[in-house]
Amino acid sequence: MLEGLVSQESLSLNSMDMSVLERLKWVQQQQQQLQQVVSHSSNNSPELLQILQFHGSNNDELLESSFSQFQMLGSGFGPNYNMGFGPPHESISRTSSCHMEPVDTMEVLLKTGEETRAVALKNKRKPEVKTREEQKTEKKIKVEAETESSMKGKSNMGNTEASSDTSKETSKGASENQKLDYIHVRARRGQATDRHSLAERARREKISKKMKYLQDIVPGCNKVTGKAGMLDEIINYVQCLQRQVEFLSMKLAVLNPELELAVEDVSVKQFQAYFTNVVASKQSIMVDVPLFPLDQQGSLDLSAINPNQTTSIEAPSGSWETQSQSLYNTSSLGFHY
């Protein structure tokens, strides 16, 4: 029994080794066929070259995939052994071989090309989709940032408006208080200026009236324009009058040496009384003179007058003429108008 079991196990292992060798030979044949197809094909596409490179660089992967079809032996032998080539509970002889169906290489190449194209398209679409999504996210972020900035700006504007309103109200209150004080002070100043202006107008009116009165009194002032010129003329006229008064007082002192009047000490009333007395005395003297008869032609008849009386009359008349001439000369020398 043991010999039979050992023989069966050795046969199975030998058959397994033969199948692996046949598998390797088949893989080499497939690679040679692929190379021949690619060399004889007129359309050498880059996809086929990529496939060949993939198959040439990954021979180990193909081998592994080929060996993956074979199941590993378990701990038990006999009924549990199965190679995948037939039903279990059967033994394989050395002469048995694995009959492989022929595979269309063109179909395999087309399938692999389609798969690579699909993978490439997926890889291309992924970044496009990513870029679109990124653009959408960026747009959303921008919109959110803009809305936040606008909200912040609105809030800032509201705060600034509120602060400006409060500042305006405070400034208005302060300005109103200042305006009230200013108006009060300005009103007082205006009242003072108005009073001053009214007083000044009244004073100027009085001065103008007095100047007009002086113009009427003083001869020659109507020809002068300007208050300064008028005042100069008035001063000259007053000085001339003063000189005339002094001259008259001197003449009176000569005529009446007993009185010895001092012009500076004599008051105006006394001066007026003295002149009235002098005029009365002159009139009494003229009353004593007889009336002169008139001729038919209206001339005086001096034959009725005594020669003594005529001499007495002629003497004072001559003295009065000399006095009048002297007064005229002094007036002409002292004042010119």
Swiss-Prot record:
One GO molecular-function entry: DNA binding
PROSITE patterns referenced in this protein's UniProt entry, alphabetically: BHLH (PS50888)
Residue ranges, annotated region (Disordered): 119-180
Places the protein is found: Nucleus
Bias-annotated ranges (Polar residues): 152-165
GO cellular component: nucleus
InterPro entries the UniProt entry points to: bHLH_dom (IPR011598), bHLH_ZIP_TF (IPR024097), HLH_DNA-bd_sf (IPR036638)
bHLH domain segment(s): 191-241
Biological process according to GO: brassinosteroid mediated signaling pathway; gibberellic acid mediated signaling pathway; regulation of DNA-templated transcription
More details: Plants over-expressing HBI1 show increased petiole length and early flowering, and plants suppressing HBI1 display dwarf, short-petiole and late-flowering phenotype. Although HBI1 contains a degenerate basic motif it can bind DNA in vitro.
Biological role stated in the UniProt entry: Atypical bHLH transcription factor that acts as a positive regulator of cell elongation downstream of multiple external and endogenous signals by direct binding to the promoters and activation of the two expansin genes EXPA1 and EXPA8, encoding cell wall loosening enzymes. Transcriptional activity is inhibited when binding to the bHLH transcription factor IBH1.
Subunit structure: Homodimer. Interacts with IBH1.
Name assigned to this protein: Transcription factor HBI1
Gene: HBI1
